[in-house]
Amino acid sequence: MSASPSPIGAAAGLDHLQARRDEEVVDSEKDALAHDSHAVNSGIPHPTATAPTIGIPIVPISAGRESSAPEEKISRSSIAASSDILHNPPSEKSISSAVPKSHRYKKSKFNFLKSRKKKEEEEKKNKEKEKEASVLPPVSFFALFKFAAPLEIVAMVFGLLLAIAAGSCQPLMTLIFGRLTTSFTNYAVIVNQISQGGLTPETAAALQAAKDDLKTQSGHNALYLMAIGIGMFLATWLYMFIWNVTGELNSKRIRERYLAAVLRQEIAYFDDLGAGEVATRIQTDCHLVQEGTSEKVALVFQYAGTFVCGFVLAFVRSPRLAGALISILPVIMICGGIMMTAMAKFGTAALDHIAKAGSLAEEVIGSIRTVQAFGKEKILGNKFADHIEKSKVIGRKGSIFEGFGLSIMFFAIYAAYALAFYYGGILVSHGDANSGIVINVFMSILIGSFSMAMLAPELAAVTKARGAAAKLFATIDRVPAIDSANKEGLKPDSLHGEISFENVRFHYPSRPSVPILKGFTTTFEAGKTFALVGASGSGKSTVVSLIERFYDPVSGVVKLDGRDIRSLNLNWLRQQIGLVSQEPTLFGTTVRGNVEHGLIGSIYENASPEEKFELVKKACIDANAHGFIMKLPQGYDTMVGERGMLLSGGQKQRVAIARAIVSDPRILLLDEATSALDTQSEGIVQDALDKASRGRTTITIAHRLSTIRDADRIYVMGAGEVIEQGSHNELLNNENGPYAQLVNNQKLAQEAAAEALQEDDDIDDLDDTVLGGASSPMQEKNGQLYRAVTGRSLASIAMDDIQAKRAEDLAAEDKIPSSFALYARLLRMNSADKLIYIFAFIAAICAGMVYPSLAILFGKALSDFEIQDPNELRQALSRKALWYFITALAAAIVIFFQSAGFSRAGWDLNGVLRKKLFTATLRHDIEWFDEDRNSTGAVTSNLADQPQKVQGLFGPTLGTVVQSCATLIGGCIIGLCYGPLLSLIGIACIPILVSGGYIRLKVVVLKDQRMKKLHAASAHLASEAAGAVRTVASLTREEDVRRIYSEALKGPMKLNFRTSIKSQCLFAASQGLTFCIIALVFYIGALWIIDGKYSTASFYTVLNSIVFASIQAGNVFTFVPDASKANSSAASIFRTIDNEPAINAESTEGKMLDHEHVVGHVRIEGVHFRYPTRPGVRVLRNLTIDVPAGTYVALVGPSGCGKSTTIQMLERFYDPLAGRVTLDGIDIKELNLANYRSQISLVSQEPTLYAGTIRFNILLGANKPMEEVTQDEIDAACKDANIYDFIISLPDGFDTEVGGKGSQLSGGQKQRIAIARALIRNPKVLLLDEATSALDSQSEKVVQEALDKAAKGRTTIAIAHRLSSIQHSDQIYYFSEGKVAEHGTHQELLAKKGGYYDLVQMQNLSRQ
């Protein structure tokens, strides 16, 4: 890649480099919006080469995208003063009693603000300390290649020598350029002398000799230029190819070793890592190392070669002139440093607010149902907008500094032109130099200086690689305490399966101050089934982890058949154990492949495929999985999707059980294997577990005590010790014991009622309810007639209409509007900056016209060297120097307005787009969010990424594009004016010259993007394994994963090898051809000068205005990716903004209800429904439910029967395909949506709290503005929710920060705050969607009391898996396959002995 002395090349390169770096950050950070913010990428522009430019580099292009700071997430630290209490909450009553009421919640605002400020300072200091502690020193440059083979090292050294040779070509070219200039000047002098003295035979002979000499010199020098071009082509092709291939090989080895090292680490290693850190290392850091060890290393040496050769040549030719010209370097460095510091300051501050906005967006979009249920889209949208507005204000300030810094820096560059001609004129007039030497030295210094600037971004890539490698190598070199790669250890020939713990003490390495096991001693006899029960944190799962040897005890010993497990070979130990966890991880392969993973390390590992399949099939039959597997589209060869996402929870569990038992292990560990399942799925899975545990040592952990009643022995754990043990019946005999208390918390009454309810009529076939309303006799008749004619129900027809509309929407998304239409709309959207855009456009055009205009000045300056009188020569060049100085001042002014104007407008547009996109996103209905493309991750990623990409084009980049176009057009016009014929030749060569920029884009700029895409599949595989490291370790899949990963890396490597030969050849050809074209123009120009068609001044004017302007204009291709990304991003943003959801909470249409007159009578009539994303699944089928005002109704049934869908229908998250939902007899579709939802409150299974105070989160439920809610109303809601005493016991009371997603509170505390939020609006209807299912028994009891209190006097509809919480309901509806199978009171349904009765029996713990 060639260095260019031109600032236009420099600045354009800066834009593309900034874009590239922005994209790296956005790609690596956008699926995570809450990480520490790094320093903003800004500062001194680093010019990038596009072609060997030797003309006058005059036009600057504004700095790149400093203002377009990428999205990065800011992690939110916990508030120090309250975190201890929140994480380790003592008894709430004891806390409450310890705080006198007179002092509770009476803190002054001053004290609160003071304490908040102090906390923020402490938080900042802690973050700085953590950051310092986590920083590793970068590895040495040579360490980057420590895995390279000797032959590769030889090839790389040879490539570096070629890179240095390629870098030397441009300074050598200036030498040729200087010699040609001298020849032209000498010829012009002779012509002038002859013209002054008249034509005589002697002068005619002298003139002919001068012509012959010029023709000969021009021919020779043109050949030299072509030779340099050919040499540049060969050297560039070879070194780019060599370093590209060796970089890929080196990266492949590092990736393989890093993943191998990760998989061999003990589990404690992962406890200290962030959730996505391993994935980030694999996807991002390995890419950074590859980028910094491939051709960028060679480019560093090329630019260094250019710098050294240029300065050496300059000082050899004229030490005095060279010494004067190097004065520009410190000025450029100082100005760039100041600008970098200022931009980093403003950029980091802007990033802080953008990151906070991104974090808020993730929370809000991740809980969109809660947001819409409470109608708080506007409040949360305003909070988001506040952060964006603050970032915009800071970005505007930074824009001024950016423009000012660039204008000063480029003024210094242009002033150097004036110095060159002024001082050069003095030297020539004194006979110390000639025109060729002045041009040679000037261009050599300029090329050398810019090569140093261009070296910086490539050197930055190497520096980043060193930093990234430090993290990778730290893991690669780390020897874990528990090493799965260690082949040592005993492998006994036989195993009985007896496990014993002897005085085991343990704490997690990440929490050394929290003891988990305290002298734990017990024995699990071989072949028996044991159960561990107890409260959360009592040490149950830790026991399983110690048996798997995920951790080693701090003291004591764990033995297997009397041997310390630390003496056993680790892989052998884990291969004897089958583990099924609460959330089993399946890998992205087939059902068969997942089960076969359980055969690794067994005697069947290398069995034939047929034999393996028989084992897999048997294991699946034992696990009750064979039946559903055979119903899958491809049976055992069906892909299960990422993490088994295409299977239900129960299906995943059964496949995991089959995987655990397929190798017939002697030990089976079941860590809450059924707790996440509904009762029906739990029953099926529990049967599979009971069958699988026969003849094995089985240890089960369960919250649902019904699953372990048949265990041989049950251990009740508390505070890391066994506090009670025995069989189920033995433990129940101790009525006051801890186990009996746990049972009582889940106990159901067993008294049966005398009479049973009549079964509901089967209404399976009544699908013809008329769409959208109650069924009148005429409508029913019409519906039946329609079915008779078409054979299809109205619900089915409605679903077809929805599907057709979705297909139309998807087709429309593939159509991107014209660029003109998009850009016009974007400019209209940012119309507030209309004047700024106008001034910036004018400034960019003026900056673009500077280059061709000064081509005239350059040509005239060179013609001045023809003057023979020293004084006159010096005066003429001094005048040209003055004009250069004036040009420098003018250019500095237009550069300031261009850079500052476009940068500011870019920030403003970014802010407008973010706010409008976020507001439009929240306006969409739930159906929109259900689509995979609109998942929380995808939407938050788009919110972070898309406005950024539009800003990337409509900020400084837009100015650069306008400037480049102005340069090209202006150059052609001036060239045609000064020399039409030569201009036409130059214009004919424009496609070739401009293509250099395009080829550079394809080869260099897009190369990194292409390689990232090629590595996406292998990176996903590695991330999947790293994200399921416990599963990988328990299955001893480490070697298997390494093998698959290595195979996956071969594809990108082979493809890169094949494409590199062609692409690098094209790139090298574009560099070499430029020299050849310049040689052609020079030679033709010399011939026409000899023929008298052109003067020297005209020739150089045409040469600079067209040829070199075309080269620089080729830089516009650098921004093709920006334009493409901006177009697609803008189109996507406008689609989101323009989309009108069918259920629009912002709509002002519909009847308004008076809250005081709402009774709360809810009725669902003949509702049919299918989710649009799953049109083949009928969810609700003619569902009819009547809930009288003020009653408590419960919905129960197996998973997938339609209970939660019913709640969502009541919230009007969806509309039924047929039938209707009414409130007080009015179809809810006729009501104003926002007003309707204000009558309802929802408490879900996983309550969402937002970053902010407890007060803020409670007030989100209010129906009136927050400032109008009184403290008494807040207190009353909190007392009803059983959370008031806890809140006022906190140091900051209601002003305590809850952390992101309520992270500073326990599950029970979050749930009760959510209940208070639901109650503060005094709802007429309360919806409870499994509000206690995720809690342990103790928390469930407290929350259930709050719910019972909250339900009094309100229409309440509750869903619960734990039937103990709803047995006193006024009416219980038992769902089956989307319809009501039976309903009645608890006692009435028990008497029926139907589906509800079966559920009760499965959870009945007190039956003997």
UniProtKB/Swiss-Prot annotation:
In alphabetical order, the GO MF annotations are:
ABC-type oligopeptide transporter activity; ATP binding; ATP hydrolysis activity
Q: How does it sit in the membrane?
A: Multi-pass membrane protein
Q: Which reaction does it catalyse?
A: itraconazole(in) + ATP + H2O = itraconazole(out) + ADP + phosphate + H(+); voriconazole(in) + ATP + H2O = voriconazole(out) + ADP + phosphate + H(+); fluconazole(in) + ATP + H2O = fluconazole(out) + ADP + phosphate + H(+)
Residue ranges of every copy of the ABC transporter domain listed in the record:
499-744, 1162-1402
One biological process GO term for this chain? Answer: oligopeptide export from mitochondrion
This entry's comment on induction and repression of expression is: Expression is not induced in the presence of fluconazole (FLC).
Q: Which residues bind ATP?
A: 534-541, 1197-1204
Q: Which UniProt keywords apply?
A: ATP-binding, Cell membrane, Glycoprotein, Membrane, Nucleotide-binding, Repeat, Transmembrane, Transmembrane helix, Transport
Q: Where is the ABC transmembrane type-1 domain?
A: 157-464, 838-1125
Q: Where is the composition biased (Low complexity)?
A: 1-13
Q: Where is the composition biased (Basic and acidic residues)?
A: 17-38
**Signal peptide interval:** none
- Per the record, GO CC terms? mitochondrial inner membrane; plasma membrane
Among InterPro entries, the record links this protein to: AAA+_ATPase, ABC1_TM_dom, ABC1_TM_sf, ABC_transporter-like_ATP-bd, ABC_transporter-like_CS, P-loop_NTPase, Type_1_exporter
In terms of SUPFAM superfamilies, this protein maps to: ABC transporter transmembrane region, P-loop containing nucleoside triphosphate hydrolases
Q: What parts of the sequence cross the membrane?
A: 147-167, 223-243, 296-316, 321-341, 408-428, 436-456, 838-858, 882-902, 952-972, 973-993, 1072-1092, 1099-1119
Q: What happens when the gene is disrupted?
A: Caused higher susceptibility to nocodazole and rhodamine 6G (R-6G) but higher resistance to cycloheximid (CHX). Causes further increase in susceptibility toward fluconazole and itraconazole, when AFR1 and AFR2 are also deleted.
- Tagged with keyword Cell membrane: yes
Subcellular localization, per the record? Cell membrane
Glycosylation annotated at which residues? Answer: 244, 934, 1127, 1182, 1404
| Pfam families in UniProt | ABC_membrane, ABC_tran
Its main localization is membrane
Q: Which family does it belong to?
A: Belongs to the ABC transporter superfamily. ABCB family. Multidrug resistance exporter (TC 3.A.1.201) subfamily.
Give the function comment from the record: Pleiotropic ABC efflux transporter that confers resistance to structurally and functionally unrelated compounds including azoles such as fluconazole (FLC), itraconazole (ITC), posaconazole (POS), nocodazole and voriconazole (VRC).
Protein's name according to its UniProt entry: ABC multidrug transporter MDR1
Supply the source organism's classification. Answer: Eukaryota, Fungi, Dikarya, Basidiomycota, Agaricomycotina
* Designated gene of the protein: MDR1
